[in-house]
From Swiss-Prot:
Record-linked PANTHER family: CELL DIVISION PROTEIN FTSZ-RELATED, MITOCHONDRIAL DIVISION PROTEIN FSZA
Record organism: Enterococcus faecalis (strain ATCC 700802 / V583)
Record's protein name: Cell division protein FtsZ
Protein's gene: ftsZ
Matching HAMAP family: FtsZ
Listed Basic and acidic residues bias regions: 360-398
UniProt keyword terms in alphabetical order: Cell cycle, Cell division, Cytoplasm, GTP-binding, Nucleotide-binding, Septation
Amino acid sequence: MEFSLDNNINNGAVIKVIGVGGGGGNAVNRMIEENVKGVEFITANTDVQALKHSKAETVIQLGPKYTRGLGAGSQPEVGQKAAEESEQVISESLQGADMIFITAGMGGGTGTGAAPVVAKIAKELGALTVGVVTRPFSFEGPKRGRFAAEGIALLKENVDTLLIISNNRLLEVVDKKTPMLEAFREADNVLRQGVQGISDLITAPGYVNLDFADVKTVMENQGTALMGIGVASGEERVIEATKKAISSPLLETSIDGAEQVLLNITGGLDMTLFEAQDASDIVTNAASGDVNIILGTSINEDLGDEIRVTVIATGIDESKKDRKPHRQTRQAVQPMQQTTQSVEMDQPKSQEEASAFGDWDIRREQNTRPKVDESSLEQVDKKEFDTFHREEPNHNDDELSTPPFFRRKR
């Protein structure tokens, strides 16, 4: 029996990266300079002058009638209306993509206002949509910070996963003498590594193979995400590479609490099974929860002694973290050490009603005594209820005033 491949089947997932606004356009240019492969680049902006410097294959002027190519003037509503005017052009440029990265700098006009519109279009086309945005420096002012927060909230509603890079953390990572362009390149590396890592996962065959379906499983409708790549060599190479991959100092989130992790390990012919286990153990311990790890390994002889670890972690929203303690409200009961108060709190009503001891409870002081028919008590001699069977003396007031010693002598 002979088998043949359908020539109409796509040989690989189509990945597109669209930079929206000035910050997004700069990020795309730097990725092209870094020679990122297997991706189609698009730049969209309201500013015609900025578009002239774009190195992307496809360039889109947003809202030519509304803004006349003059930019959004740091007003998000202008950026939004400009993107809405150009919806058809945006849709045509994104057509055919399986995965779309949307990158923008939040807080300004075009990126903040247009990025959510672009994301909505991407989702409507059925593409796996990932947002990678930067939050402005605090010294840029509270108004810009407020615009950024509002834009991020809107974007999050229209993407599958979202990575937020904090510009403030650049001040903690880079040296004081680091040139500005080099500092911003550190932020762009988060996007570049994520895009290149996913592109490599999809296009390069692996010994334990990962494909686009695995990426989609981990990233679809998962909220806040973490993506990172770590490379190291030497005896502790897999430990160092994995720690680098899961600890991006510029991202506003950590892997702690992740529910889904895609982990790919690439090494030379000397990569061992135990190294794959070590990487998985590090990720599992860092996630510190009931994490689902999808593991892949691939061999690349060109790496030599180096090992490369790619991590995509999702499902780490703060709201999900807040709900975690509620799943662990009940604790294991330790006999002879449980206090009365904790028993009351942990004992479910169903157990109280269907207890093996019936209605009897060791906490007698809290039990409700059964009601007794008072009419039946009138027919019972009081002596039967006297615990010590003592007769109640019938004495008058004079006897009470007489000491007991003299009363016995009478």
